[in-house]
C-alpha cells in the first residue's frame, strides 16, 4: 500500500484517515468522512485550534503504553502485562475514542465524536478512563511479567 492510499486527501493526515476507517460502518466511507470532518470543524470553531492538532493531542493522551495479554502456563491463565507497539497503541486509542463517542447521549455522531476528542485531549472522558483501567490491570499483574 502506498503512502497516498493511507493519507487523507483534504486534511493531509494519516491519523484522520485512520479515524475515518474506525468510524466507518457498512462500507459508507463518504458518510464516515463527513462525520469526522464535521467533528474536526466543530473542534476548530470551539477553541480556534486546528482540529487535527486536537485529534493528535487526544490520541497521545489516550494511547496505552502497556496492556495485558492472557497467557496459559501449566493449566492456569495469567494476565501478563506487555508493552504496546506504537501502531497498536494508536489503533486502540482511536477505537476507544469512537466507542465512547458512540456511547454518549446525543443526536449527531459528529457532535458526540467532537466532544469525546475534546475531552480526551483535556484528560477526561471515557477513552481516558479505559486507558487508566488498562494501566491499572497491567500494574496489578506486574508480578506475572516474567511469563512473557
From Swiss-Prot:
<dbReference type="Pfam" id="PF00177">
    <property type="entry name" value="Ribosomal_S7"/>
</dbReference>
<keyword id="KW-0694">RNA-binding</keyword>
<comment type="similarity">
    <text>Belongs to the universal ribosomal protein uS7 family.</text>
</comment>
<dbReference type="InterPro" id="IPR005717">
    <property type="entry name" value="Ribosomal_uS7_bac/org-type"/>
</dbReference>
<keyword id="KW-0150">Chloroplast</keyword>
<dbReference type="GO" id="GO:0003735">
    <property type="term" value="F:structural constituent of ribosome"/>
</dbReference>
<dbReference type="InterPro" id="IPR000235">
    <property type="entry name" value="Ribosomal_uS7"/>
</dbReference>
<dbReference type="GO" id="GO:0019843">
    <property type="term" value="F:rRNA binding"/>
</dbReference>
<keyword id="KW-0687">Ribonucleoprotein</keyword>
<dbReference type="InterPro" id="IPR036823">
    <property type="entry name" value="Ribosomal_uS7_dom_sf"/>
</dbReference>
<dbReference type="GO" id="GO:0015935">
    <property type="term" value="C:small ribosomal subunit"/>
</dbReference>
<keyword id="KW-0699">rRNA-binding</keyword>
<comment type="function">
    <text>One of the primary rRNA binding proteins, it binds directly to 16S rRNA where it nucleates assembly of the head domain of the 30S subunit.</text>
</comment>
<dbReference type="GO" id="GO:0006412">
    <property type="term" value="P:translation"/>
</dbReference>
<keyword id="KW-0689">Ribosomal protein</keyword>
<comment type="subunit">
    <text>Part of the 30S ribosomal subunit.</text>
</comment>
<protein>
    <recommendedName>
        <fullName>Small ribosomal subunit protein uS7c</fullName>
    </recommendedName>
</protein>
<dbReference type="InterPro" id="IPR020606">
    <property type="entry name" value="Ribosomal_uS7_CS"/>
</dbReference>
<dbReference type="InterPro" id="IPR023798">
    <property type="entry name" value="Ribosomal_uS7_dom"/>
</dbReference>
<dbReference type="GO" id="GO:0009507">
    <property type="term" value="C:chloroplast"/>
</dbReference>
<keyword id="KW-0934">Plastid</keyword>
Amino acid at each position: 500500500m502506498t503512502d497516498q492510499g493511507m493519507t487523507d486527501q483534504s486534511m493531509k493526515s494519516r491519523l484522520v484517515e485512520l479515524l475515518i476507517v474506525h468510524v466507518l460502518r457498512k462500507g459508507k466511507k463518504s458518510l464516515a468522512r463527513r462525520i469526522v470532518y464535521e467533528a474536526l470543524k466543530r473542534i476548530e470553531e470551539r477553541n480556534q485550534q486546528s482540529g487535527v492538532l486536537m485529534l493528535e493531542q487526544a490520541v497521545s493522551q489516550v494511547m496505552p503504553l502497556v496492556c495485558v495479554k492472557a497467557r496459559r502456563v501449566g493449566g492456569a491463565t495469567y494476565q501478563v502485562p506487555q508493552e504496546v507497539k506504537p501502531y497498536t497503541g494508536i489503533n486502540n486509542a482511536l477505537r476507544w475514542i469512537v466507542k465512547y463517542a458512540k456511547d454518549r447521549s446525543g443526536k449527531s455522531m459528529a457532535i458526540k465524536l467532537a466532544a469525546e476528542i475534546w475531552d480526551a485531549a483535556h484528560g477526561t472522558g471515557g477513552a481516558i478512563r479505559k486507558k487508566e483501567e488498562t494501566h491499572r490491570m497491567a500494574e496489578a499483574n506486574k508480578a506475572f511479567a516474567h511469563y512473557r
